[in-house]
Amino acid sequence: MGNSTSLFQRLVNTFIIAMQEPNKLTKETMLKIAIDKQYVNVVEYLIRKRVNIVNCRNSYNPLISAIETENEEIVNLLILNGASVNELSHTNNTPLHVAVDKNIKP
């Protein structure tokens, strides 16, 4: 029984690490896909599993992606869980710049 628990823990840990890795073809992380598809429950799950929500690989900024989808619930989830509102994108824009560019009103 102890062996199966250990195996289970290793599988879970491997899965958590894999969640951070971008897809080899699309270069997108699970978080990026969930944000783009606006799967709030998946974003919540990934946050609970402590995936990186600040700045991911390939200069991808999850908060900026959420702002671009105009999904206020995901934007709030990310901010409440530590996403930086000052983190720059690969084009040197902050999330506020992106919101203004999209003409998003408070």
From Swiss-Prot:
It holds the Pfam family Ank_2. SUPFAM superfamilies: Ankyrin repeat. InterPro entries: Ankyrin_rpt (IPR002110), Ankyrin_rpt-contain_sf (IPR036770). Keywords: ANK repeat, Repeat. ANK repeats lie at residues 26-55, 58-87. PROSITE patterns: ANK_REP_REGION, ANK_REPEAT. This is Putative ankyrin repeat protein FPV241. It comes from Fowlpox virus (strain NVSL) (FPV).
